[in-house]
């Protein structure tokens, strides 16, 4: 019990330093594709007017240059998503990795500290967050129509985005065939303090998301309480231990941050992953969980995890 409490406290403190709602009827899912910037034959930026959020959202898509119908992998960012470019393409080799693969990789921009969910109330710092409505109702028809999507989807993400991937999959089980979390904590009972701290650390009011701790909305978004809704899906989780590894041997400006903050965060995530795995096992739900003996909460490892996850996710989508 003490180990669990310490892990929660460490995760809550460190995470904030590092970089549809039940009982409410969401606005009608209507979005408009404003424009497309074809940045290359295999990379496009879509500018989509979201009715739910009353703003234009940029979504970058990695896609084959041609061909027929294909699945889509919605890949979410961390606590501080890129504004002009997805951090997945800026900090990892995701673009070259997916080149030649028969899949659309959908990378939404923006949404700092949003947890990609529908907030109960508009926030003075962030404005109107209705990310679940956007990602699950407004965006998929546009992606499928524009990039020959065949309706087969997976969703994944790192840290905040990985938590959100499991939340969205549990709340929208018919939409996704596979789910991936890279250094994510899908057990909100353990992650609650970290989530609230991280939102406040970025200037938001955590109560505007799902209300105060103990509110019904927290339970209604907790994948650990909805594991049966993940049954039949391909599930993937990956985590390190917080112990510095090969990427800490690289001399780079963020090295101290990766070790002194990224290490404790990843240790907390590892403990949370164990708790979530126990929930899955108790329900007899299989999952592929890669536990790396070393690794901090940092982008070099998330790039590695993305590679390691594809032999699990690709076949589930019908894409190699």
Q: How should these model regions be labeled?
A:
Residues 5-11, 18-320:
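Non-catalytic cap/lid and distal C-terminal segments of serine-dependent acyl enzymes
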């Amino acid at each position: 019990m003490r180990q669990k409490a310490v892990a929660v406290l460490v995760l809550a403190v460190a995470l904030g330093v590092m970089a549809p709602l039940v009982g409410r009827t969401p606005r009608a899912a209507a979005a408009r594709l404003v424009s497309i910037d074809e940045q290359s034959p295999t990379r496009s930026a879509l500018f989509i007017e979201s009715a739910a959020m009353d703003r234009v959202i940029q979504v970058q898509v990695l896609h084959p240059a041609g061909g027929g119908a294909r699945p889509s992998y919605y890949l979410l960012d961390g606590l501080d998503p890129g504004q002009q470019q997805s951090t997945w393409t800026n900090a990892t080799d995701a673009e070259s990795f997916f080149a030649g693969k028969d899949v659309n990789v959908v990378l939404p921009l923006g949404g700092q500290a949003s947890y990609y969910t529908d907030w109960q109330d508009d926030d003075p710092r962030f404005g109107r967050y209705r990310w679940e409505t956007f990602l699950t109702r407004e965006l998929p028809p546009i992606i499928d129509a524009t990039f020959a999507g065949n309706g087969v989807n997976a969703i994944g993400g790192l840290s905040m985005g990985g938590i959100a991937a499991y939340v969205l999959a549990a709340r929208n089980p018919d939409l996704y065939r596979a789910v991936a979390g890279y250094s994510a904590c899908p057990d909100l009972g353990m992650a609650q303090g970290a989530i609230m701290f991280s939102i406040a650390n970025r200037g938001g009011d955590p109560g505007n998301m799902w209300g105060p701790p103990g509110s019904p909305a927290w339970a209604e978004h907790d994948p650990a309480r909805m594991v049966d809704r993940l049954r039949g899906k391909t599930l993937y989780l990956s985590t390190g231990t917080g112990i510095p590894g090969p990427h800490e041997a690289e001399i780079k400006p963020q090295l101290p941050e990766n070790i002194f903050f990224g290490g404790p965060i990843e240790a907390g995530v590892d403990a949370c992953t164990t708790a979530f795995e126990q929930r899955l096992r108790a329900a007899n739900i299989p999952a592929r969980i890669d536990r790396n003996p070393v690794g901090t909460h940092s982008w070099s490892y998330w790039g590695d995890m993305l590679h390691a996850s594809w032999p699990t996710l690709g076949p589930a989508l019908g894409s190699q």
